[in-house]
Amino acid sequence: MNTSHIVLMICFIVGVGQTALALKEDDCEVCVKTVKRFADTLDDATKKDYKLIETAFKKYCKTQKNKEHRFCYYLGGLEESATGILNELSKPLSWSMPAEKVCEKLKKKDAQICDLRYEKQIDLNSVDLKKLKVRDLKKILNDWDESCDGCLEKSDFIKRIEELKPKYSRNEL
């Protein structure tokens, strides 16, 4: 009887410990969001075969930019990737493993995967563009896939952003 209590206590402690160690979306945000977004693009036939998942991921990576592109590089989804741990993504996805668990396994293989973080978005409706640095103004345009040909002064960048703002800003009511 006493031994069974000890075994139950150990099982409880291990269970609580595993829950505490479980990866949260904020801990590995780029990985979790990218894996979820990629998994949503797969059809039922592709989801069952890890080789097809790998091929689909390489195709998916060709269209990615910024942090997602870096994530693809780390996994081996790009031609120029130095290493490849793509099977650590494709096999668990073929077993219908949730994105959080997939990223947990990937983190064990390569910790820098979870070091990727999204940059905080600038709220264009509330920020004073004149107080931003030129680097930040350029980043806004770059995020929009827009350029500012002939822009030399800060005021030129601000003028260009103001021109494009109605096209890209999200007005929340």
From Swiss-Prot:
GO cellular-component term (any): extracellular space
Gene Ontology MF terms in the entry: calcium ion binding
Protein name, UniProt field: Mesencephalic astrocyte-derived neurotrophic factor homolog
Family per record: Belongs to the ARMET family.
GO aspect biological process, one term: neuron cellular homeostasis
Cited function: Required during the maturation of the embryonic nervous system for maintenance of neuronal and cuticular connectivity. Essential for maintenance of dopaminergic neurons and dopamine levels.
Pfam family, one: ARMET_N
UniProt keyword list: Developmental protein, Disulfide bond, Secreted, Signal
Stored InterPro entries: ARMET-like (IPR045333), ARMET_C (IPR019345), ARMET_N (IPR045332), EF_Hand_1_Ca_BS (IPR018247), EF_hand_dom (IPR002048), SAP_dom_sf (IPR036361)
Superkingdom of this protein's organism: Eukaryota
Disulphides: C28-C114, C31-C103, C61-C72, C148-C151
Organism listed in the record: Drosophila virilis (Fruit fly)
Main location, first listed in the record: secreted
Signal peptide extent: 1-22
Localization of this protein: Secreted
